[in-house]
Amino acid sequence: MYALALFASLLATALTSPVQDPKTCSGGSAVLCRDVKTAVDCGAVKHCQQMVWSKPTAKSLPCDICKTVVTEAGNLLKDNATQEEILHYLEKTCEWIHDSSLSASCKEVVDSYLPVILDMIKGEMSNPGEVCSALNLCQSLQEYLAEQNQKQLESNKIPEVDMARVVAPFMSNIPLLLYPQDHPRSQPQPKANEDVCQDCMKLVSDVQTAVKTNSSFIQGFVDHVKEDCDRLGPGVSDICKNYVDQYSEVCVQMLMHMQDQQPKEICVLAGFCNEVKRVPMKTLVPATETIKNILPALEMMDPYEQNLVQAHNVILCQTCQFVMNKFSELIVNNATEELLVKGLSNACALLPDPARTKCQEVVGTFGPSLLDIFIHEVNPSSLCGVIGLCAARPELVEALEQPAPAIVSALLKEPTPPKQPAQPKQSALPAHVPPQKNGGFCEVCKKLVLYLEHNLEKNSTKEEILAALEKGCSFLPDPYQKQCDDFVAEYEPLLLEILVEVMDPGFVCSKIGVCPSAYKLLLGTEKCVWGPSYWCQNMETAARCNAVDHCKRHVWN
């Protein structure tokens, strides 16, 4: 409401100013566009908007007030206020003017030219200076500079502002003359005032706090500097804003870099504080102790290097054993060969990726020939070792070079557990352990289960375990977090089923197949155990492997 009152007062003042020869409209833009009243009387409103009023304006108090009032009037129009309501409010505000003649003139202007003014406000909301130029409250910047140059030409006196600009470069070089910069920085610098040093440290500390706690501080700081540029006067303010736009990004980067630096150090570099001669050395703490303090639930690696099998081979082994067990169940039920392959394909679909893909590869490669092998009641786990997807038993190494009956006999024997060689003692590994290659999840599985074991109570429900799984990865160090998220996304259903019963890291991770056996014995070189992909290459290999009938029925048909 106060803005409208001020707006009406400015209208009265502007539109009652005299115009040279108002009866004629042949005086050019200087006369036509002097104010809105003359432009309306001569029908030159559009011409003045395009050619005169849209030009940059000089800075002045009436112009700034007018721009503010025009902006407020535009906001009032956005609030869906009708023209009659605005007219009524403006007429009421005209009555508040103490000068009776100005009050009457205000009402006359409001009644006569309000529609034209409101149309201009609606059309030029982004440039309120155009409306204020029409009201003769803002002066063209070009006209203002021309008047200043004319005044300077009419007088022989050198303006004071020019003298200051001439002297400024010489004054700025005086500190360099008094304190040459060629000396090494190790020499003591002039003592700075303690009060100035304290003020600098407080300012830097406040800025650092604002940068850390207020995300909009940087943009607000730049906007505040631009507002200060407006106080420098016409011409110079535009140059100031140009410098701000050009160098503000560099200043922001410096502020972000200094947010973790000590205020005293920054003020020393700026010359407001005395240079610190000595800085006490921080006490070094072993990395293992630092990590334990940050993550109490995270245990370090064992003091010896584990020779782990890649998780890629573990997935193949677990998939093969799953397929073989399903195959045995189907054979017991006297299923046909077509149903066997179809049933195995359906079983593969139940596995998570990438085990699903590997399972389909096993079925596609060995499925048609598995029936012949299972006739001899071969152990599924042993067969997976023969075809190279699981660790082979020692007694199979020699048998693989023998004919097929010898291979079957070796497969039917009970497996004997291999002796584990003693682990050589080595120095402790560093605290930072990179993730395994090929997407291995063994280490991250152990650390995640260990975290759950330390932070969950016994007999925890599935919901509690699931909640702990979803946030547990965020407590691991950075090298493990992404790998942990992938691990949980892939093994979450299987993990839940096992963790409800037991939370031993070694058992759980071995149970789901991400931590394989540390040793894998080499297989023999007998190619006939490679399966149909080798048997059915040609008639010669099929005959040598006694698989001619199989290749004719399943591959060559």
Curated annotation (Swiss-Prot):
Saposin A-type domain span: 18-58, 521-557
Subcellular location: Lysosome
Disulphides: C63-C138, C66-C132, C94-C106, C197-C273, C200-C267, C229-C240, C317-C390, C320-C384, C348-C359, C442-C515, C445-C509, C473-C484
A Pfam family this chain is assigned to: SapB_1
Domain Saposin B-type: 59-142, 193-277, 313-394, 438-519
Propeptide residues, chain positions: 17-59, 143-193, 277-312, 393-437, 520-557
Any single GO CC term annotated in Swiss-Prot or TrEMBL for this entry: cytoplasm
Keyword Ribonucleoprotein: no
GO biological process, one term: cornified envelope assembly
GO molecular function, one term: protease binding
Keywords for the protein's UniProt record, in alphabetical order: Disulfide bond, Glycoprotein, Lysosome, Repeat, Secreted, Signal
UniProt keyword annotation of Transmembrane present: no
Glycan-linked positions: N80, N214, N334, N459
Signal sequence annotation: 1-16
Entry function: Saposin-A and saposin-C stimulate the hydrolysis of glucosylceramide by beta-glucosylceramidase (EC 3.2.1.45) and galactosylceramide by beta-galactosylceramidase (EC 3.2.1.46). Saposin-C apparently acts by combining with the enzyme and acidic lipid to form an activated complex, rather than by solubilizing the substrate. Saposin-B stimulates the hydrolysis of galacto-cerebroside sulfate by arylsulfatase A (EC 3.1.6.8), GM1 gangliosides by beta-galactosidase (EC 3.2.1.23) and globotriaosylceramide by alpha-galactosidase A (EC 3.2.1.22). Saposin-B forms a solubilizing complex with the substrates of the sphingolipid hydrolases.
Quaternary data: Saposin-B is a homodimer. Prosaposin exists as a roughly half-half mixture of monomers and disulfide-linked dimers. Monomeric prosaposin interacts (via C-terminus) with sortilin/SORT1, the interaction is required for targeting to lysosomes. Interacts with GRN; facilitates lysosomal delivery of progranulin from the extracellular space and the biosynthetic pathway.
Name of this protein: Prosaposin
Taxonomic lineage from the root: Eukaryota, Metazoa, Chordata, Craniata, Vertebrata
